[in-house]
Amino acid sequence: MAAQSLYRRYRPQRFSELKGQEHIVRALKNSIVNSREGHAYLFSGPRGTGKTTTARILAKVLNCDSPVDGEPCCACPSCLAVQNGNSFDVIELDAASNNGVADIREIIASASLGSPGRNRVFILDEVHMLTKSAEAALLKTLEEPPTNVVFVLATTDPQKVGETIRSRTQHLQFHLLQESELEEHVRWVLADAGLDVSPETIEAVVRQGAGSVRDTLSALELAVAVGGIAEEATPVD
């Protein structure tokens, strides 16, 4: 079996593990603790800042058997199913390649079905890539959402998402991390993984990561593989 990449190995499984997005963690946990979850969210921000990861954590806690203070337990069957990517309650769609009205109608039909868990969560990535007709089909469902259905729309370009869609979602904006935050995270990953690299390598991968946890860990993995500072790292989607 191939070894997991550092990014996948250290992908956050709880809100508390997310780096540099405290404002989003606070908003989501408060809404869950107070039972004021939205039926539709728009997560926007640069690539590699945790939008899809946060959506999956939200899906976990909304279906968790034993949530604690707005966090998923990460141990119940529902949480494990989401973590393993085989949950019937969580449906993900890459709108960059599935952007037509037929794709959205399939999602809408699925939303009307019952769910084994408490909530059915639909995660639509790169939602700004939807066609106008697909957006119109989605809008109708957002205006009259089925019971116990939550939509999480993720995008790197929120201005390309129709205003009517944006107005019917809770918009949470993800930010790139500061270099100091990335350096702290890299040092923690190195210690936990039992890896040793030079301070110059840490500085280089943080610089290459340019604020993205995903790109930083991809650069770190390449640097470890070649035994030193990687001059250029290829981003991983």
Predicted features by range, described:
Residues 66, 193-197, 230:
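Short, polar/flexible loop-turn hinges at active-site or ligand-entry regions and domain interfaces
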Residues 122, 187, 191, 201-208, ...:
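C-terminal helical "lid" of AAA+/P-loop NTPase domains
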Residues 172-175, 179-203:
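Helix-loop-helix "sensor" segment of P-loop NTPases
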Residues 48, 98, 176-177, 196, ...:
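Short, surface-exposed acidic/glycine-rich loop or hinge patches that mediate macromolecular interfaces
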Residues 17, 179, 198-199, 213-216:
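Alpha-helix N-cap/helix-initiation sites
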Residues 1-171, 180:
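P-loop/Walker A NTP-binding region and its immediately flanking N-terminal helices
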Residues 59, 199, 210:
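N-terminal phosphate-binding caps/lids of nucleotide- and nucleic-acid-binding domains
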